[in-house]
From Swiss-Prot:
This is Ribosome maturation factor RimP. Coiled coil: none annotated. It comes from Pseudomonas putida (strain GB-1). It holds the Pfam family DUF150_C. GO terms for cellular component: cytosol. The keyword Cytoplasm applies.
């Protein structure tokens, strides 16, 4: 996790949790002049638009005061959704047995993209099975990971 992301997590997670929600994760995507700060929230029973609104108002107020991002950005607050992103070892462990798509920051064994069965975690590694081969991917090397929804 980058230091900017760690700073944003430390600043915003207490705000989200203080409102009674779980801070599922935070993404900061900087693309030239257009940057996006995404806060994913969750709670028992699911998230409503009003929940996102409440978190957005509080997060905006804190971000305006603390000003951790010097450039312009768009703030988005949403539920993790069906294809929920995975950020922590605990989240990977709790979704063992599901199909995932993982993108790494840099190639591992000649590839950056892995799609397969999430087997779980071992220490600081995420274990994913692609076809009949298991890969142990260091959590710090993962750029993006999402559950692949099953419509069985």
């Amino acid at each position: 996790m980058s230091s900017k992301l760690e700073q944003l997590q430390a600043l915003l997670a207490p705000v989200v949790e203080g409102l009674g929600y779980q801070c599922w994760g935070i993404e900061y995507v900087s693309q030239g002049k257009h940057s996006v700060l995404r806060i994913y929230i969750d709670k028992e029973g699911g998230i409503l638009v009003e929940d996102c609104e409440a978190v957005s108002r509080q997060a905006s107020a804190i971000l305006d005061v603390e000003d951790p991002i010097s450039s312009e950005y768009t703030l988005e607050v949403s539920s993790p959704g069906m294809d929920r992103p995975l950020f922590t070892l605990e989240q990977f462990a709790s979704h063992a047995g599901e199909q995932v798509k993982i993108k790494l920051r840099s190639p591992f064994e000649g590839r950056r993209n892995f799609q397969g069965l999430l087997r779980g975690v071992e220490e600081q590694d995420v274990v994913v099975q692609v076809d009949n081969q298991e890969f142990l991917l260091p959590i710090d090397s993962i750029d993006k990971a999402n559950i692949i929804p099953s419509f069985d």
